[in-house]
């Protein structure tokens, strides 16, 4: 299995917290899919959840070689946890089309946080 793309992103959690305070859930509704938004609403650490998802989606978009835009939106990239709690990605629309164009079949995702930052790395295989 060869690596077709690699993406990494880092997000300052305080920046997300500030945006949530100023704009309410507007940012979350732009970034998260419906199922992600349901988890966000019930989360006790909303800014952390959103920061990690933002970083993950940016990392995936970078691995696809497009970034957000150019046919790939936040809504085309959905994160979820497998039965062991590992982060996974489900692509749709422009993101799925781009992965298929590149000959990819899966994306491996790692998400972490430490006090002030959330970071994610995505590998397209």
Curated annotation (Swiss-Prot):
Molecular-function GO term, any one: holo-[acyl-carrier-protein] synthase activity
Alphabetized InterPro entries for the sequence: 4-PPantetheinyl_Trfase_dom, 4-PPantetheinyl_Trfase_dom_sf, ACPS, Ppantetheine-prot_Trfase_dom
Catalysed conversion reaction: apo-[ACP] + CoA = holo-[ACP] + adenosine 3',5'-bisphosphate + H(+)
GO CC terms in record: cytoplasm
Domain of life (superkingdom): Bacteria
GO annotation, biological process: fatty acid biosynthetic process
Enzyme category, top tier: transferase
Binding of Mg(2+), residues: 9, 58
E.C. designation(s): 2.7.8.7
Annotated localization: Cytoplasm
Reported cofactor(s): Mg(2+)
Annotated keywords: Cytoplasm, Fatty acid biosynthesis, Fatty acid metabolism, Lipid biosynthesis, Lipid metabolism, Magnesium, Metal-binding, Transferase
Gene3D superfamilies, A to Z: 4'-phosphopantetheinyl transferase domain
Protein function: Transfers the 4'-phosphopantetheine moiety from coenzyme A to a Ser of acyl-carrier-protein.
Family: Belongs to the P-Pant transferase superfamily. AcpS family.
Name of the molecule in the record: Holo-[acyl-carrier-protein] synthase
Organism: Shewanella amazonensis (strain ATCC BAA-1098 / SB2B)
């Amino acid at each position: 299995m060869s690596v077709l793309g690699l993406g990494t992103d880092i997000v300052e959690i305080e920046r997300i917290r500030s945006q949530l305070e100023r704009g309410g859930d507007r940012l979350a509704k732009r970034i998260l899919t419906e199922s992600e938004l349901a988890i966000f609403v019930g989360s006790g650490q909303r800014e952390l959840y959103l920061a990690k998802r933002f970083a993950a989606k940016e990392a995936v978009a970078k691995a696809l070689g497009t970034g957000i835009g150019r046919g790939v939106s936040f809504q085309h990239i959905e994160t979820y946890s497998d039965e062991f709690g590992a982060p996974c990605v489900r692509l749709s629309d422009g993101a799925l089309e781009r992965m298929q164009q590149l000959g990819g079949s899966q994306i491996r995702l790692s998400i972490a946080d430490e006090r002030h930052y959330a970071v994610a790395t995505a590998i397209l295989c």
